[in-house]
Curated annotation (Swiss-Prot):
GO cellular component, one term: endoplasmic reticulum
Transmembrane spans: 6-26, 41-56, 60-76, 83-101, 121-136, 207-227, 241-261, 325-338, 341-357, 377-397, 408-428
Organism: Rattus norvegicus
InterPro entries: LPLAT_7/PORCN-like, MBOAT_fam
GO terms under biological process: lipid modification; peptidyl-serine octanoylation
Family listed: Belongs to the membrane-bound acyltransferase family.
Post-translational modification: Not glycosylated.
GO MF term list: acyltransferase activity, transferring groups other than amino-acyl groups; serine O-acyltransferase activity
Lumenal side, ranges: 1-5, 57-59, 102-120, 228-240, 339-340, 398-407
Catalytic activity annotation: octanoyl-CoA + L-seryl-[protein] = O-octanoyl-L-seryl-[protein] + CoA; decanoyl-CoA + L-seryl-[protein] = O-decanoyl-L-seryl-[protein] + CoA; L-seryl-[protein] + acetyl-CoA = O-acetyl-L-seryl-[protein] + CoA; L-seryl-[protein] + butanoyl-CoA = O-butanoyl-L-seryl-[protein] + CoA
Protein name: Membrane-bound ghrelin O-acyltransferase MBOAT4
């Protein structure tokens, strides 16, 4: 009963599981002939509203208000100015909510309600959809809802025109978790003809359920190992590495199981399947590729594959638009988006330095190491170093507080990121001399 109690009674998992029958019902209704497009939008929107109220209670207003404001700005602003204003409004709103969490945790020293944590997580996902949509409009990929030429349209027509946008921002399969779905893909899936709508693959859902079950069993076993060992305060040398690695493994298993559950909900509703996809339609990007994450010896590849849709969103929103220090700016924005806790700021900035060092180290090694035995040894050592550094970053980010960060930095584990920092300095200096 240990893993059942830990996973299925987790609030987000519980609400995601409760939404599953409605996702299957939506998929079934889309296959029938009597479910028009507007009814599909309304079903997804109503489901999102009910799920938000059930999961967040009164805090659901923190989701509804920015979603309605975003639709109002999208409907009234020109494509040239829509992204800048919606971005600053959405990030400003999210930052205020995170400051409320800081005030509760650090000033009042009170644990915030679980519903507030769920709301903040959903708000971060809403920020992804709002900024993705505003970017699509500013880049001309999506037709703007700007009504400058139709100012005499009735209120009812304005509301029907805004329905796809508000439905996209609040549709229930992605409200509490899941891979970022672009507005183009969302609209294509909702408007897909009955003949092209993918049927429910119970084998695919069963396989995902078995994956979740296996991950939860591993998590139970690993949690017992972690609870039986010493903490970072009492560990010594190699024991610190083992404690850090096992604790980070517990975090990773939790993320993997939740991402697979979120992916299953999107598939059940018909938003995650490639079946029935039209030519030119955007492909679905799942958040997790466990094999790549656990076998890669490149920190930079891990960064691109960890929570893949979010990594692609950050690349588009920040990295590709930055003229100087794009890696640093991307990770700094990620720390802002996550809430600017001390551990998060340190963790993401440390990660950015590790990615930069990773590029230089592997570029240098690829030019020097020729024989396959040395390459095998090099790959093994860099794989171990990558896993340890990722574990270090993960403990910093998940620990969040300044006291947890101090314990981590004062432990024996800090020797590994310091080693990469020294290699970065030496290789950057060598590269500068060669140039």
């Amino acid at each position: 009963m240990d893993w059942l109690q830990f996973f299925f009674l987790h609030p987000v998992s519980l609400y995601q599981g409760a939404a599953f029958p409605f996702a299957l019902l939506f998929n079934y209704l889309c296959i029938t002939e009597s479910f028009p497009t507007r009814a599909r939008y309304l079903f997804l929107l109503a489901g999102g509203g009910v799920l938000a109220l059930a999961a967040m209670g009164p805090y659901a207003l923190l989701i509804f208000i920015p979603a309605l404001c975003a639709v109002a700005m999208i409907s009234s602003l020109s494509p040239q100015e829509v992204h800048g204003l919606t971005f600053f409004f959405q990030m400003g709103w999210q930052t205020l909510c995170h400051l409320g969490l800081h005030y509760k945790e650090y000033y009042l020293c009170e644990p915030p309600p679980v519903r507030f944590y769920i709301t903040l997580s959903s708000l971060m996902l809403l920020t992804q959809r709002v900024t993705s949509l505003s970017l699509d409009i500013s880049e001309g990929k999506v037709e703007a809802a700007w009504r400058g030429t139709r100012s005499r349209s009735s209120l009812c027509e304005h509301l029907w025109d805004a329905l796809p946008y508000i439905s996209y921002l609040l549709f229930f399969p992605a409200l509490l978790g899941g891979s970022l779905c672009s507005f183009q893909r969302f609209q294509a899936c909702v408007q897909r003809p009955r003949s092209l709508y993918p049927s429910i693959s119970f084998w695919a859902l069963t396989w995902r359920g078995l994956q979740i079950l296996g991950l939860e069993c591993l998590k139970v076993a690993l949690r017992r190992v972690v609870s039986a060992g010493a903490g970072l305060d009492d560990c010594q040398r190699l024991e610190c590495i083992y404690i850090m690695w096992s604790t980070a493994g517990l975090f990773k298993l939790t993320y993997y199981s939740h991402w697979i559950l979120d992916d299953s909900l999107l598939h059940a509703a018909g938003f995650g399947s490639e079946a029935g996809q039209r030519p030119g339609e955007e492909r679905y990007v799942p958040d997790v590729d466990i094999w790549t994450l656990e076998t890669t010896h490149r920190i930079s590849l891990f960064a691109r594959q960890w929570n893949r849709s979010t990594a692609q969103w950050l690349k588009r929103l920040v990295f590709q638009r930055s003229r100087r220090w794009p890696v640093l700016q991307t990770f700094a924005f990620s720390a802002w988006w996550h809430g600017l806790h001390p551990g998060q700021v340190f963790g993401f900035l440390c990660w950015s330095v590790m990615v930069k060092a990773d590029y230089l180290i592997h570029t240098f090694a690829n030019g020097c190491i020729r024989s396959w035995p040395l390459r095998l040894l090099y790959r093994s050592l860099t794989w171990a170093h990558t896993q340890i550094i990722i574990a270090y970053v993960m403990l910093a980010v998940e620990g969040r507080s300044f006291s947890s960060l101090c314990r981590l930095c004062c432990s024996y584990n800090s020797i590994f990121p310091v080693t990469y920092c020294l290699l970065l300095f030496l290789l950057a200096r060598r590269k500068h001399k060669c140039n």
